């Protein structure tokens, strides 16, 4: 059985500000990242719209159900993420961290499986996570804003927030936006 579900994805890439961002070669980064990730899990899983949080290396993917949360409330979580970052850097001054963030939205196909206790209950088919990873890798290598919205996420934002957003950027034919720089 297949079900369509509107979702949003927050993709984060956590990096050490001054040191190498590798868990094995930089134990201070591992400690900072672990603290940040634990605080993030405790805060975000309380929200009814949070479906899943995945971590791979220094990347974190947060999947939101758009039936339970709107784009504006998901964008508000950026403030929570930034607050957790400040707390992490205060507790781990030897390895301060920063992040890049990409927000994406779209329809995900969920395929229910006949499962036993060892198999997953469902498979989510979507290219949204792959697209966010491509944008994260592009903005991580250059002087771009640390937060980007794909066009699909941008369309869901209210007009009052769209007024604060500037011209588009293009990565691998993916249109993205960011906030206007402060003067």
Predicted segments with their positions:
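Juxtacatalytic helix/coil linker segments
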Residues: 1-49, 182-183
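Intrinsically disordered, glycine/charged-rich C-terminal tails and inter-domain linkers
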Residues: 1-2, 120, 131-134, 140-183
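A generic structural signal for short hydrophobic patches within well-formed alpha-helices
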Residues: 17-20, 60, 153-154
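Alpha-helical scaffold within the catalytic cores of cyclic-nucleotide enzymes
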Residues: 31-50, 62, 66-101, 105, ...
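A short pre-motif secondary-structure segment
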Residues: 51-55
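Catalytic cores and conserved motifs of cyclic dinucleotide signaling enzymes
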Residues: 69-72, 110, 123, 144-147
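Catalytic-core segments of nucleotide cyclases and related cyclic-nucleotide turnover enzymes
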Residues: 75, 111-140
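Switch/connector loops and helix/strand junctions flanking conserved nucleotide-binding motifs
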Residues: 109-113, 156-159
């Amino acid at each position: 059985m297949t079900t369509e579900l509107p979702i949003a994805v927050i993709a984060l890439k956590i990096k050490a500000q001054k040191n190498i961002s590798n868990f094995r070669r930089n134990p201070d980064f591992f400690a900072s990242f672990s603290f940040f990730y634990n605080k993030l899990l405790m805060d975000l899983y309380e929200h009814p719209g949070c479906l899943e949080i995945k971590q791979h290396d220094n990347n974190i993917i947060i999947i939101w159900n758009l039936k339970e949360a709107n784009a504006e409330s998901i964008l508000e979580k950026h403030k929570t993420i930034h607050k957790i970052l400040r707390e992490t850097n205060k507790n781990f001054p030897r390895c301060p961290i920063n992040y890049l963030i990409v927000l994406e939205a779209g329809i995900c196909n969920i395929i229910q499986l006949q499962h036993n206790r060892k198999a997953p209950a469902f498979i989510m088919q979507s290219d949204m996570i792959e697209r966010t990873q491509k944008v994260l890798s592009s903005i991580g290598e250059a002087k771009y804003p640390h937060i980007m919205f794909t066009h699909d996420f941008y369309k869901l934002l209210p007009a009052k927030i769209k007024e604060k957003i500037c011209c588009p950027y293009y990565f691998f034919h993916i249109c993205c936006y960011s906030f206007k720089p402060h003067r």
